[in-house]
Amino acid sequence: MDAIRVPIMTDATLAASRRAKVTKPFRGTYTVLITPFTPDGGAVDIPALARLVEFQIANGVDGLIPLGSTGEFLSISRDERAAIVDCVVKTSAGRVPVLIGTGAEDTREVVALSREAEAQGADGVMIIPPFYSVPTLPELMHHYGRVADAIGIPIMVYNNPATANVDLTPAMLAEISRIPNCRYVKESTLEVTRVRDIVALCGDRMEVFAGVLGYESAWLGAIGWVAVCSNVAPRLSRDMFWTAAFDADRAASLALYRRLAPLLPFVGGPRYVSGTKAAFRLMGMEMGEPRPPRLPLPPEDTAALAAVLRGMGLIADRPA
């Protein structure tokens, strides 16, 4: 494979590019990137990450989000975080917005991580609530308010009660949306009617990105989708959401969704990281294994995944 050529940009040019991006609203399909590791899992595979970014942009995704749950952010050191952000920001070079996952339990750490992300060139940050202390609404208002006061880039609030142990209901988000920088929410429950309720309660203060139900959310007012499946199938994922949310073409979007649907069980649920990395291996794009305690996808599931990828045309058919 040819080496990836990354355009060289001066600090002034990169800063100007970032300012231009921030003035535009985030919308469309944003891939929450996996983190490639070396074969022994001991280091982040930065060249593989750069190839992944190029693969995503070449296939039309609208934005990139490293260091989310799919990126195994809780298994990443502080130095590795900095290297990941540097790689994604510099490789994308202003072609698509880059949001960085900066969630942590301690508000002070979230502030520090968010400031670092902004200093490294991020266009925004995605922040899950503190996930052990089960904060109240006043505590959440204080938490997000402190971060918003510390940075000048937009915040995407991340609601995932299955992992955060706190559920940001539409009524709570209506209050959080009054914090000026909290302009987006990633809504990751399986209650798709919440998209409708957030749109109604928040108005233009906060826009909705689907976190799970991309197809369904598009019809209820979501302007974006933070997708795991777009790691593996970026063009199909992007086209499906765009055709539903912005073209309002039911027949075309449903046809695309039906093509994508067989992949979703393998990149969702408890094995979403191992399934995504196994898919890349089958596609000839090695991304390493998940870090423990996650384990690789079992062989029987890998065989089933291979059949799905063949059916989608993402890997070649077996020789007759």
Where would I find each of the regions flagged by the language model?
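A general structural signal for well-ordered alpha-helical segments in protein cores
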Residues: 49, 81, 85, 110, ...
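Active-site beta->alpha loop and helix N-cap motifs at the rims of alpha/beta catalytic domains
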Residues: 11-165
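C-terminal alpha-helical cap/extension of soluble enzyme domains
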Residues: 10-21, 25-36, 55, 59-61, ...
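Catalytic alpha/beta core domains of metabolic enzymes, predominantly
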Residues: 149, 161-268
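Secondary-structure boundary/capping signal
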Residues: 96-97, 155, 184, 206, ...
